[in-house]
């Protein structure tokens, strides 16, 4: 079973939990053999709800003693069995897409209701709902292979892919999804959203440090990857959010369009 985010990852992206023992069954305080070990120890830290697996009725067992919930659940690891599965913000028919999992990626299930499973993505701890029929036994589905040494080359291979909010390369891709996917295939684990990446990916570059291929360049609500010192590859929303795609264009052109210009540069490689 894949472990949830480590303590180091919590510090970087605001994830709310550390690795826990997998028993694959839910339990409340009445049946929890560890119940006496869990006590709240003061005001809880501010936690990013995107990566904190808690609802009004239950939470991941690793949050016991950190956040209160009526029930704590040990997650079950499942794997995506279809080409891609949409992660949604609820189990309703009008739910919005927040991310996407690709074939073989792991999803930690905390609850099943109707046709949906609620839990979090094993690779980045992102919470949400997945269609239950997109998941299968992780023991029978191999995890995606790391097949690239250069994340920039991976991003170039996605040129022309349509922009899709919440996409990671299945039905489409968004700016932070492009960054996360490109670096993941080269063995670098990054957070899901651009603000999380701005807080955690690699190290911040100083104003006196020269740009280099593979650097991440951040704007207000946007991120791209330097192809070279003057050129950016990124998933652009297009004009008014229409016709967006993964494109290569001069950094200066992106700066001219984005209010506030470049807000941050980080280096992972």
Residue ranges and their predicted role:
Residues 2-76, 92, 99, 103-108, ...:
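Boundary regions of SH3-family modules and the immediately adjacent low-complexity/disordered segments
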Residues 80, 109, 218-219:
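A generic structural signal for residues embedded in beta-strands
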Residues 95, 101, 205, 210-211, ...:
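Short, well-ordered loop/turn sites that connect or cap secondary structure elements
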Residues 163-211:
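Catalytic cysteine-centered active-site loop
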Residues 113-114, 228:
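Residue-level recognition of beta-strand termini and adjacent short loop/turns
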Residues 82-92, 132, 137, 194-205:
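Short, structured beta-strand/loop micro-motifs enriched in basic residues and often containing a Trp
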Residues 216, 221-231:
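Catalytic nucleophile-His microenvironment captured as a short glycine-rich beta-strand/loop
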